[in-house]
Every structure is written in C-alpha cells, then in structure tokens.
Amino acid sequence: MPDYRSKTSTHGRNMAGARALWRATGMKDEDFKKPIIAIANSFTQFVPGHVHLKDLGQLVAREIEKAGGVAKEFNTIAVDDGIAMGHDGMLYSLPSREIIADSVEYMVNAHCADAIVCISNCDKITPGMLMAALRLNIPVVFVSGGPMEAGKTKLASHGLDLVDAMVVAADDSCSDEKVAEYERSACPTCGSCSGMFTANSMNCLTEALGLSLPGNGSTLATHADREQLFLRAGRLAVELCQRYYGEGDDSVLPRNIANFKAFENAMTLDIAMGGSTNTILHLLAAAQEAEVPFDLRDIDRLSRKVPQLCKVAPNIQKYHMEDVHRAGGIFSILGELARGGLLHTDVPTVHSPSMADAIAQWDITQTRDEAVHTFFKAGPAGIPTQTAFSQNTRWPSLDDDRAEGCIRSVEHAYSKEGGLAVLYGNIALDGCVVKTAGVDESIHVFEGSAKIFESQDAAVKGILGDEVKAGDIVIIRYEGPKGGPGMQEMLYPTSYLKSKGLGKQCALLTDGRFSGGTSGLSIGHASPEAAAGGAIGLVQDGDKVLIDIPNRSINLLVSDEELAARRAEQDKKGWKPAAPRARRVSTALKAYALLATSADKGAVRNKALLDG
C-alpha cells in the first residue's frame, strides 16, 4: 500500500524543522498520522462566481478534520472573462488556465499533500484545476460555487443573463432606460453566469467525468442545498484517502476514473446539452494531462451520433441552469443518454462504483427516493445576494416531461445531431468548431464573402461602423493562442452582429475562441492558427467561403495553386498581422505564446519544445 505523500515532510528525525513549521500552522502530534488534504480555493472579490467562496474552504476544512484528515487551504487566481472582455484584459484569460494548473501543482507538490478538494467555478478555474488534478493523479473531489440565478425584469418575459445586457446595449433602438434596467437585472446573485456558458458547462462535465458529486453543475449558488455538496466533498476526500493509502485501492485515482471512456462520456454530455465550444479546448487539454488519447477526431465522431437533449440559454431564452436542475440535473441527461445506448455506464465515479449505479440513484425518472426528488426541486428565490446558501426556495414540482420539457429523451430530442460540431477543410486543415445548438437551421449551409479583420478590436469597430453587410463572413485572425497571444473570446463581435440584425445573415470565423454566451454561425478554434501558418492567414477580402455543417466542412473557394502562391508570399512576409495592432503584450504573455500550441491540441504547452 502506498505511503502518505505527506510522510516526506512529517516523518523522521531529519524532518524536525519541517514538523516545527507544521506545528506552527496548528498541527499536533496526532495529526502527523493523518492524511494532509489540500483545499484549492479560488475565492476572489473580482468575480461573481467566486465572491461567495471566502468561507467555504474552511467549511470543507472543518468537515475534513471531523472525518479524520488534516485540511490545509490555499488560493488560486481567478479571472472574470466578462469583465476582462472587450479590452487587452482578455489576453490573460486562457493563459490563466495554465497559471492555475501550475499553481495547484506547485502548492500540492511543494507541501506533499495527499489529496485535493478543488473549489472552482468560473471559466478557466475549473479547467485549470482539472488539468492539475490529472497531472498530479492523487485523490481529488471537485465542488464548484454553483450557477447564478437568472435575472428577472418586467421588460422581458424570459429570464435574463449577461448576454442579454450586452445585446441591448449595442442595439441603437433600445433606450438608455431599457439598457440600465437590463444591466441591473441580468446578474442578480453570486454564482457563475446563469446559462450554459463555459463555467456551467465545465462544472457539469466534472459530473460526467466522475470527479464531482451529483448536482455539482446545476445546484444554484444561493441555495441551502449546495452547502451539503461542500460538506460531502470534505468527507469524501478523507474516504478516498483511506481507500487509496489505507487499502491500496488505486481505482479512486483521477486517471483511473477520468479514463478514455469517461472523456467520451463528458464529451457526449457536452454535445447533448449544447455546451460551450470552450469545453472542447479544455477537455483536450485535460486529456493530455491524463495521458488519455482523446482528440478532436473523437469529438467529431461523437458529434455525428449524439442528439441534442437539452437546450439552455444562450441557445434558447426559455431555460437557464435553474431549469436544468428542476428537470433533474446532469444525471437525468446522462440517464437519457444511457437509455439511448450512448453512454459508458461501467466507469467508476468518486461517489459510486459505476456510472450505472449513480444514474439509478440520481436520475429523477428512475429513482423513487423522495430525498433526491426534493433535492432537484431546489429553485431560485429571486432575491439579489452575494451570499452562498442564503435561500431555501423549492419548485412546486419537478420537470420530468421528456417530450417537451427542458431535458428531452432521445426519441424527443431537440435535434438528431448534437449541439457541437467539428468542421474540416482547406481553411482549417486541423479542424475548427461550431456550437450548432445556437445556429439557425436556415444557415447550416452558408456561402459568403470574406471580410478580413486582423484583430477583435478591428472587427468590433467594423461591425459597429456598418462595414459588415448581410452575406459576409467575418474573418478575425491572429487571435489564436500564439497569435493573440491568449486566444481571446469573441463575444462582443457576435453580440454586435446580433444587435445589428445580422445574426442569421452573417457568419464569423476565427482562430480565436468564443464565450459560452455566443450563439449564431460562429466558428472558432481554426487550426492551425494564422500565427502558426494556418490557411486562415491566407484569406483575402472578397474571397468566397463555403460552410457546410451537415457535411462537417468549411472551405475557401480558391484554387490550390492560388493558395500555394499566397503561402509562398506570406512565408516571405512572415506570419503576422498585415496591420499594426495597438496591443500591450507583456513578458508574461510572450512567454505563454512561445510555448502555446493551436486549439486542436487544447492550446496546451508544446512539450516537444520543453523536452528538447
């Protein structure tokens, strides 16, 4: 049986100095026989998804210590993509994922912790911690801060979210009073933004990967029920330590739980619920850390057979995460996928022997457990707050309508093919991705004229300045991981296209990425990126581009000979923007760009460069 990792610094005469320091943190003689469990918290007052996490690390710590462990909390950074968006701050968002992963590794390995409880929530924090957990491969439990309640206003018949505020602000026909009302109403509580954006998508995927408890992705941040997830996570971390270190059961290690089948399950869920395209980027990165051979071709294969069973904002205005929870949360979607023969149910989870066992216990259409039904009735209170667990509102009934409800059965799917697709062609030889859940069927096949912008800033200026017309395909390039650097999100350009009435009349292609709040014919992650010699860097104004989602293709309608001539010319000039950009690129960002790979590899570091 493996020794506690922490014995490195807690046992032996020569560790007297280290033990003296441990004692200074409050440890006693008896504590040196217990597992040391790191709590990676991500509390910050900058981010609504994390503003309520301040005391939750110690909540978990107390539960760990009651269960027989020693808890030690530390913090990571957390960037708010919504606040960082639309200016140079967005250059730091994706690179922060690597910083978070590294910081968790640094703290856990420097202090020889035996296990981790990861308290995450928003866009890059859950992926960063997931990468670290799979890199370290010690017992781990994820528990996130939970989703925000949807906003309410008398000016709209549907729930509001961040994207609604952005769209009305850019719509010249909306009064200042309406914009102000949406601004004040869109984000009413603490928690990750209320739709199926990147943060909520990733927190849902941790359930499918088997690394978090049921309800982690859908239980509202404000609801009292969420406290139980934190308490159970603390107890579970100690239990996993006992099974691994005490009994030699390595099935509890994250790489043995999040194996190839589990990654397929996570991607299957993502496709079925129309999650953010960013999840593709993060799952590819996590798979590399887990040494799982899961790549873009696997995602392409799954996208062709998995139907869309759930539609949530921004793909539809009617439903938000609180509605997903009322419909039974993630395990109800997993249950429908399992009944459709689309899920691996023999994989283990941190809380159940198998996914099949977990579905039987937690799918509201299978279980008769009244406690489970009560749990999924947890609903919004509609009271603005920044306090976790501050309300106990219940829906009067569950949404178990699998024909016309929020979550559908395979037989009543929103669409036969899922909400995400991978496209290939001469403009993206290594692939690009589109959230089909947010694309109107009338433009699933679209041919248009390229309108070139060498940066997001230039595109925003062009769209707001009416340079983009119906039938155009907006090309935003040199915004990839290396070229940005940092692979900015393009939520502003897509929102402004909507506000200009062009949401169903234009397309957008970029080597950058999109916010989970994006909808419309928005194609990102074009690989190779322009800065790496990708063909997106060869497109010229007026070129025709054909997008064909049903056939999973995207092609620049230019001859191979012409492309070869353009490539030879570009090689001479160097792969950089044709127009200068007023962009501050710090040493930290330059270091990131030096090692960054294109999006088809998850935008992770190029290990070949590091290994020499």
Swiss-Prot record:
Q: Which PANTHER family match?
A: D-XYLONATE DEHYDRATASE, D-XYLONATE DEHYDRATASE YAGF-RELATED
Residues given in the record as [2Fe-2S] cluster binding sites: 122, 193
Name the pathway it acts in: Amino-acid biosynthesis; L-isoleucine biosynthesis; L-isoleucine from 2-oxobutanoate: step 3/4; Amino-acid biosynthesis; L-valine biosynthesis; L-valine from pyruvate: step 3/4
**Which keywords fit this entry according to its UniProt record?**
2Fe-2S, Amino-acid biosynthesis, Branched-chain amino acid biosynthesis, Iron, Iron-sulfur, Lyase, Magnesium, Metal-binding
State how it assembles. Answer: Homodimer.
- List the taxonomic lineage: Bacteria, Pseudomonadati, Pseudomonadota, Gammaproteobacteria, Pseudomonadales
Q: Which family does it belong to?
A: Belongs to the IlvD/Edd family.
Any idea which GO molecular function terms this record carries? 2 iron, 2 sulfur cluster binding; dihydroxy-acid dehydratase activity; hydro-lyase activity; magnesium ion binding
Which top-level enzyme class is recorded in the Swiss-Prot or TrEMBL entry?
lyase
Q: Which cofactors go with this protein?
A: [2Fe-2S] cluster; Mg(2+)
Any single GO CC term annotated in Swiss-Prot or TrEMBL for this entry:
cytosol
Q: Which residues carry this modification: N6-carboxylysine?
A: 124
NCBIfam families in alphabetical order = ilvD (TIGR00110), PRK12448.1 (NF009103)
Q: What is this protein called?
A: Dihydroxy-acid dehydratase
What the protein does comes down to: Functions in the biosynthesis of branched-chain amino acids. Catalyzes the dehydration of (2R,3R)-2,3-dihydroxy-3-methylpentanoate (2,3-dihydroxy-3-methylvalerate) into 2-oxo-3-methylpentanoate (2-oxo-3-methylvalerate) and of (2R)-2,3-dihydroxy-3-methylbutanoate (2,3-dihydroxyisovalerate) into 2-oxo-3-methylbutanoate (2-oxoisovalerate), the penultimate precursor to L-isoleucine and L-valine, respectively.
Instruction: Give the GO terms filed under biological process for this record.
Output: isoleucine biosynthetic process; L-valine biosynthetic process
Write down the species. Answer: Pseudomonas aeruginosa (strain ATCC 15692 / DSM 22644 / CIP 104116 / JCM 14847 / LMG 12228 / 1C / PRS 101 / PAO1)
